[in-house]
């Protein structure tokens, strides 16, 4: 009986851990993701994270630039005090090619779900340190013209995450070019 309970408990524990696994890219060429990108859609685990117009997470990716150390500089644009502002976020490389550590925007990890390097890139920022465990994802495109295939890839990728996500289209009028 003890053995059965131990086996059942172990099986449940393994099942819980399997739910937390996020499907990320196994390889990433940071040189190929360099350049201009446009945020075409956002998704959040908690819509209140993006409620306020000046929410710190309402930042739009404008470009990516790899550093010689293998880190990734992320050029963001956002509104502060009704004006356009730029911010550069440094994402530090980890042992996993598509996962980076960040210390900004109340988040602590950035990971890439998918990219073809030429037309789309799907990334998420996660705060696993807080009790709420928040997640914000963005669908990026090289051009402002987005086809249905990119939207579908984003929706499909979000379904694989461990928390339910709500998709919000990126509002072009909220974005600014600085």
UniProtKB/Swiss-Prot annotation:
GO cellular component: extracellular region
Pfam families per the UniProt record, alphabetical: Lipocalin
Assigned keywords, A-Z: Disulfide bond, Milk protein, Retinol-binding, Secreted, Signal, Transport
Disulfide cross-links: 84-176, 124-137
Location of the protein in the cell: Secreted
Main subcellular location: secreted
InterPro entries: Blactoglobulin, Calycin, Lipocalin, Lipocalin_CS, Lipocln_cytosolic_FA-bd_dom
Keyword Signal attached: yes
Subunit field text: Under physiological conditions beta-lactoglobulin exists as an equilibrium mixture of monomeric and dimeric forms.
Recorded family membership: Belongs to the calycin superfamily. Lipocalin family.
Protein name according to UniProt: Beta-lactoglobulin-1A/1C
Species in which this protein is naturally found: Sus scrofa (Pig)
């Amino acid at each position: 009986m003890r053995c059965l309970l131990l086996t059942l408990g172990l099986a449940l524990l393994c099942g819980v851990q399997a739910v937390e696994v996020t499907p990320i890219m196994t390889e990433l060429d940071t040189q190929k993701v360099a350049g201009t990108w446009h945020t075409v859609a956002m998704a959040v685990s908690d819509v209140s994270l993006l409620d306020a117009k000046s929410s710190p997470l309402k930042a739009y990716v404008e470009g990516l630039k790899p550093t010689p150390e293998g880190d990734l500089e992320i050029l963001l644009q956002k509104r502060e005090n009704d004006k356009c502002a730029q911010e550069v976020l440094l994402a530090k490389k980890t042992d996993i090619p598509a996962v980076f550590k960040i210390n900004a925007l109340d988040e602590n990890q950035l990971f890439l779900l998918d990219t073809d390097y030429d037309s789309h890139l799907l990334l998420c920022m996660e705060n696993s340190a807080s009790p709420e465990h928040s997640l914000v994802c963005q669908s990026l495109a090289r051009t402002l013209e987005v086809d249905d295939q990119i939207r579908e890839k984003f929706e499909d990728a979000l379904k694989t995450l461990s928390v339910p996500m709500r998709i919000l289209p990126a509002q072009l009028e909220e974005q600014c070019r600085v």
